[in-house]
Amino acid sequence: MADPGPFVADLRAESDDLDALVAHLPADRWADPTPAPGWTIAHQIGHLLWTDRVALTAVTDEAGFAELMTAAAANPAGFVDDAATELAAVSPAELLTDWRVTRGRLHEELLAVPDGRKLAWFGPPMSAASMATARLMETWAHGLDVADALGVIRPATQRLRSIAHLGVRTRDYAFIVNNLTPPAEPFLVELRGPSGDTWSWGPSDAAQRVTGSAEDFCFLVTQRRALSTLDVNAVGEDAQRWLTIAQAFAGPPGRGR
């Protein structure tokens, strides 16, 4: 399995960048609304704290994580939102401190996961490297919500490659959660990275293909921007359909933006 080290390093850097955005905000700004309906900046950080806690539980306490799965199944529509709302009520200073401590513990635990161990999650079980990538994706996406709320445009980084990779790998999942049969044939996905280099997945002679900006593809698969506003294009009926349902995150179909 892949060494989790580089992925954890990217996750740490992404988390630190978001931390820097909110660390010096006046307490009242944590109540600013974000593009996610009903969610403030405090909700966004609270959600990341909660999911980092849950990921830490998945690594360190398999029985405890199984209990969380049972609770989630009992309240599938409100489980995530309820947790974010509860944590958003905590003072910003306490919330930020708790997130810093929790994510730091998670990063260290991911580095210590034995090679070959699969970690339980709300989607398929995954390696420590994949867990770090999933946390990177979510931290980037919710960080984007915070940046949008603050009117900040964040520079694209090479860390987007792992998020794009996750978006490609979850192609079939996006079809399945939308009650559609995944395409039998592979797609070519060819994206332009922030430095102008090309990132590609799939056979070069594939009939169905997706091309465009890597950053915009990441906006798409995290459902942070509407497809009509993005430099992402598809050739082929199945590839075109995928762009309308793509999601790199676990759970039911997202509502998009």
Curated annotation (Swiss-Prot):
Superkingdom field: Bacteria
Disulfide bonds: none
InterPro entries: CHP03084, DinB/YfiT-like, Maleyloyr_isom, MDMPI_metal-binding, tRNA_wybutosine-synth
A cellular component term, taken from the record's GO annotations: plasma membrane
GO molecular function per UniProt: metal ion binding
SUPFAM superfamilies membership: DinB/YfiT-like putative metalloenzymes
Any Pfam family the entry gives: Wyosine_form
Gene3D superfamilies: dinb family like domain (1.20.120.450)
Designated name of the protein: Uncharacterized protein Rv0036c
